[in-house]
Amino acid sequence: MAKKRVIRCLIIILTIVLAGVEMFWLSRRKTIKQYKESQAAFGNPLMGYVPSAWYNEVSEDISLLYMDITWAELEPEEGVYNWASIDEENQISRWRKEGKHLVLRFVCDIPSDEEHMDIPEWLYEKSGEAGRWYDGEDGKGFAPDYNNPTIISCHRKAVRAIGEHFGQDGLISYVELGSLGHWGEWHVNYSEGIQRIPREAVRDKYILPWTEAFPDAM
């Protein structure tokens, strides 16, 4: 019994010694770096603030860029998509070659200084001019009626087309749930008489097409 106790103690001591030796060598291999405070922007892979895709100059460590597309520029005629202009403006070929990724937002209403629409003219007419023109503190523009069945149906087709064009090679890493509200931010200035963002059941009809078009994006 005493012999077993001695052996057990020796094993424990040996284990402690070996652990101490290992920790000693690991501490000697440790590298300590000191960084100076800086206000410069630096890359943070696939996260954080990102520059716009149309920027001509971005630092090499930037891996993610931002692209928004208005419905008016995407589909000037029903079923006809303006890919050549969109790809050129956002330098899609360049970013693919450089291995960059994009954040995408689809927008239907961007207030500005001038009266305008960010949905196509054909959709405005096809939906029975469903929505409201506004001129307020956010700017001027047209807020579509997102409850309109025609707009919902055509939105689904537009998103499917975007997925077919951009969703095949991992270029789009993130899809921002735009589509609804000013700047695609899911809010409107309803105090100016603009119809509120629709209820959840209708909102889902604007969300689900994106999950189908970009199943691998976040």
Regions found by a protein language model. Give the residues of each.
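Short, well-ordered beta-to-alpha junction loops that form the rim of enzyme active sites
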Residues: 107-108, 176-180
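N-terminal substrate-binding region of glycoside hydrolase catalytic domains
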Residues: 31-147
